[in-house]
Amino acid sequence: MSRAVRTLALGGLVLVGLSACVSVPRGQGSGAAVADHVSDSARQAEAARQAWLQAHPNWSFQGRVAISKDRNGGSGRIDWQQDGPRYRVQLSAPVTRQSWVLTGDTTSGAGRLEGLDGGPRSGPDAEQVLLEATGWTIPVNQMPDWVRALRIADAGAARVDLDAAGRPRTAQQDGWTIEFLAWTPAGADQPELPQRIEARNGEAKVRLLVDQWTVSP
């Protein structure tokens, strides 16, 4: 990776304290502790939530993200749009007005990154494209399920711990440890969805705070 590309990618996102970036506002649903026992009614409610989400594959969210690996890191706004297996993710730094757009398909795993100095980059592995361009490790093909806490156990997670409501609280998958720290309350048109998520894999960390969820009918 060229030094110029690394400088652009890391310099464009405002470097700030990660915890400050993803602090949960007051009044938002908070996460619960891992439960020793989950009632049958809670398991049924979670199964219904999962079924509803699988029946609604088109969705989007806006929020804030903080990414770090070793001593490199940055934070900014994130706008994720999902249309079945296809996604479009825009990362932007309001202060510098720079932005990057990653598009891809979770079925094929391929991706394309735009907004880099020197033009777009694309390849058969979106995660590798992002790693080579920015130095960041982000499991983009797992993220659509992770951000909704959907099919975690079915996706090959080595371990899943639940809270008393039957929702995933922590999970381990493909070397990553994912924590679901806060949830948005259910509304008239959608079930509970994660609000704050932290994922770690060695020195790689991703912290996400969702400000708004939209699920298409």
Curated annotation (Swiss-Prot):
Covalently attached lipid (S-diacylglycerol cysteine), positions: 21
Membrane topology of the entry: Lipid-anchor
One Pfam family per UniProt: LolB
CDD domains in the record: LolB
Organism domain of life: Bacteria
Family: Belongs to the LolB family.
Name by which UniProt lists this protein: Outer-membrane lipoprotein LolB
Source lineage: Bacteria, Pseudomonadati, Pseudomonadota, Gammaproteobacteria, Lysobacterales
